[in-house]
Amino acid sequence: MTHNLPYKTEIKVLIFDFDGVIIDSMSVKVDEYKKLMSEFTNDEGKIDKIVQIYKNSIGIPRETTLKKVFKEVLSKNILTVEVDELSRKYSQRIFKRLESLKPLDGFLEYITLHQQLKKHIISGAPNSDLIYFMDKLGIRNKFDSVKGGPLKKSEEIASLIRLDKVKNNEVVYFGDQKNDFLAAEEARVQFIGINANKNLFKGKCPVF
C-alpha cells in the first residue's frame, strides 16, 4: 500500500473494504466454501460453478450469494433460517483456519501515517465476522466506525459523507473488487484499487 494519496484534492475521509485490503483470507474462504457446498452436491461441475459465483460475489452479502447458489446451481429452495445457519457454520470454519491472521504488509504503517484523517470500514462481510477479526488484530480502535453486511456499499458511503460533513471528492474508498469500484463510482467518491487485477480498473483509478 502506498504511503501518499495520489490526489490533489484535500482528502479528509478514508473508507476501507476489509478482505483483500486489510487482510487476505481469500484462499481459505474459497476452500471452506467448497467444503461447505460439497455437503449438498458431489458434482464437480456444480462445485466449480458455485466457486465461480462465490468469487464473483466478493463484497456482496453472504446470504445473497448463498440464495443465488441454491437457486441457480443446486435448484433447491432454501429458507432464510437455513441460510443464516449455513452462514454461521461457514464463519466458524473460517475462524478456525485464520488463527494466525495478520494485516497486509504496509497497512498499519499507512493508517498511522494518516492518523489525522477519519477512517471507516465498509464491507460486505457479516458484521460479526468483521468485529471478530478486528478485535483479533487489535485494530478496531483505529477506526471511527465499522459496518458489515448485509448492506449496499454506495448507500453506506453516502451516509458517512453526510455524517462526517465532507464533500464527495474529499473521500477515498479502498477496495479490491469491481463491485467496490462501482460502489465508489455510484457514491461519487474517489477510489483506489488494492492488490487488484490491474486490467479490472485499467485507466479508471490508481491501483496498488
Language model features: what each stretch is:
Residues 28, 61, 102-106, 125-126, ...:
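Short beta->alpha linker loops
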Residues 38, 109-112, 162, 182:
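Surface-exposed alpha-helical segments enriched in charged/polar residues
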Residues 22, 119, 173:
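Conserved SAM-binding loop
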Residues 92-121, 127, 131, 154-155:
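Short, acidic loop-to-helix structural element flanking the phosphoryl-transfer center
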